[in-house]
């Protein structure tokens, strides 16, 4: 298996789809990575030689992906919580951030219903 950015890339998939297994690489970025490395989008990973995979690694390294991106996102959320702004408070309380109603909805964010103890 080819390893790019510390992730095992599925070899039986096309290059554009396989690169999206990396956290932080979506469809648009995957196409630009393939174009920058000179890889056809419909080429399967197992058909690529080691030099081409190295080119893909170099293209992926230009972006913030995987652990660095996860750390960046978590630090951004932590900063909001430390500031005590509205979004930070909503993060701390595990409630929706963007003005959605919470009286009847928001079950995903709030978790399962808790029964009222008598």
Swiss-Prot record:
Write out the ranges of the annotated region (Disordered): 94-118
One GO MF term attached to the UniProt entry: tRNA binding
Query: Which key words are in the record?
Result: Ribonucleoprotein, Ribosomal protein, RNA-binding, rRNA-binding, tRNA-binding
Superkingdom of origin organism: Bacteria
- State whether keyword tRNA-binding applies: yes
Q: Name one GO biological process term.
A: translation
Q: Name one Pfam family in it.
A: Ribosomal_S13
User: What are the record's GO terms for cellular component?
Assistant: cytosol; small ribosomal subunit
- Do you know which SUPFAM superfamilies this protein is assigned to? S13-like H2TH domain (SSF46946)
Q: What does this protein do?
A: Located at the top of the head of the 30S subunit, it contacts several helices of the 16S rRNA. In the 70S ribosome it contacts the 23S rRNA (bridge B1a) and protein L5 of the 50S subunit (bridge B1b), connecting the 2 subunits; these bridges are implicated in subunit movement. Contacts the tRNAs in the A and P-sites.
Q: Which family does it belong to?
A: Belongs to the universal ribosomal protein uS13 family.
What does the subunit comment say? Part of the 30S ribosomal subunit. Forms a loose heterodimer with protein S19. Forms two bridges to the 50S subunit in the 70S ribosome.
What is the protein named?
Small ribosomal subunit protein uS13
Q: Which organism is it from?
A: Alteromonas mediterranea (strain DSM 17117 / CIP 110805 / LMG 28347 / Deep ecotype)
Lineage, highest ranks first: Bacteria, Pseudomonadati, Pseudomonadota, Gammaproteobacteria, Alteromonadales
List the gene name. Answer: rpsM
């Amino acid at each position: 298996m080819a390893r790019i950015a510390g992730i095992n890339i599925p070899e039986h998939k096309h290059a554009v789809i396989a690169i999206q297994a990396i956290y932080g690489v979506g469809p648009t970025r995957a196409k630009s990575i393939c174009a920058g490395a000179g890889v056809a989008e419909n080429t399967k990973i197992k058909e690529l030689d080691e030099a081409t995979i190295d080119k893909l690694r170099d293209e992926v390294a230009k972006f913030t992906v995987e652990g660095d991106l996860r750390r960046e996102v978590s630090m951004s959320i932590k900063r909001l919580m430390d500031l005590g702004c509205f979004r930070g408070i909503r993060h701390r309380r595990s409630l929706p951030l963007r003005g959605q109603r919470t009286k009847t909805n928001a079950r995903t964010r709030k978790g399962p219903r808790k029964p009222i103890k008598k």
